[in-house]
Amino acid sequence: MRRRATGLLRRDSRFVLDNNLVIASVKSGWTRSTDLLFTIILSDAELYCDLELLNEYEKYIHKFLGVYPLFVLLRNRITLVDPGIDSLMSCKPYFPESQYADVVHAATCLKTAAVMITNDAHFKKINESGLIEVWNISRAIKELLG
């Protein structure tokens, strides 16, 4: 990942943050996942999100976990993307029929050339194909926090 001399992520770093990272960051107090989330949010990295993921953020962060300021911070920090039919169709074969939201998230990564950070095993096949790059949370912590 590209860093400046200050150690901060550069503007040309691009990510889509799956909801499971955000939940892991807040459900058990301050953890390395929390460090990761805020390092990314407060950096110059580009953050992308599709409408499906934004709705997941709202549902889990705001309504279930009650951490409205984090939802507002994420909502204001991300660039909302419509992945488009071509990206959706390219990603669809790698996911079970029941995982439509994951297809949309992957298509968002494909359209924006962003790294997906997730612990969702449904992304394994598409990562192995090389169509998009997927990091689990542990790898993201290692890559971005050292």
Locate the predicted segments by residue:
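Feature 3881 marks metal-assisted phosphotransfer/nuclease machinery
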Residues: 1-17, 25-26, 43-44, 140-146
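PIN/NYN-family metal-dependent endoribonuclease catalytic core
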Residues: 14-17, 27-63
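Active-site neighborhoods of divalent-metal-dependent phosphate/nucleic-acid chemistry enzymes
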Residues: 80-115, 119-121, 125
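Mobile, glycine- and charge-enriched loop segments
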Residues: 14, 62-65, 71-93
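Acidic, PIN/NYN-like endoribonuclease modules and their adjacent C-terminal/linker elements
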Residues: 1-5, 54-55, 121-146
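Short, structured coil segments at secondary-structure junctions
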Residues: 43, 74-77, 128-130
